[in-house]
Amino acid sequence: MAAASAGNGRGGVSLCLATAGGVKALALSAFTLAWTHSIAKVEWQEDWRVTPAGLELVQARVKGTGPGMEPPPEARLVDGWFQWQPTRSPMPEVVLGNSAAAGEWRLCHGGQCRTLSEIVGHPIGANVTKMGFCKDP
C-alpha cells in the first residue's frame, strides 16, 4: 500500500487505510481494532503492531462468548474479557468487511477510539477497507 507521507517526521512506521475513496496514512506503530459482533452484540478487540513485515496481531480479547465466536482454549478471563495471544506471522494486509448490522470498525490509539469513517473523513459504507504497512510512494 502506498500513500503520501504521514508527516510523523520520526522516520517511523505508518498504518495505511485503503478505502473506495482513497488511502489514508496514520503515523502510528501500534493500535487496537475494536468492533461489535453483528449477531451476539459482543465486543471484540485486537491489539496490532505495524511493522515493515506487515501487521502483527499481538493480543485478542472478547467480552463474552457466542455461537461461532468461542475464545480458544488458551484464553484467560481477565477483568471480564477472555484474552489470548494469537500465534500467526505478520500479514501484508488485513481486509475488513463492513456490515450495517454490526456498526463500524473502531481504531483506538492514545486513549481515543474513532470509527474508520471518522478517520478517513467520509462514510465507509458497505465497501471493504484494507489495512497495511505504508510503503514509500
Which residue ranges define each predicted feature?
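Extracellular secretome segments
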Residues: S5-C16
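Surface-exposed peri-terminal alpha-helical interaction modules
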Residues: A2-A3, P86
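N-terminal short leaders/motifs
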Residues: M1-A2, L55
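N-terminal secretory signal peptides
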Residues: S14-P71
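Mature, soluble, non-transmembrane domains
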Residues: P71-P137
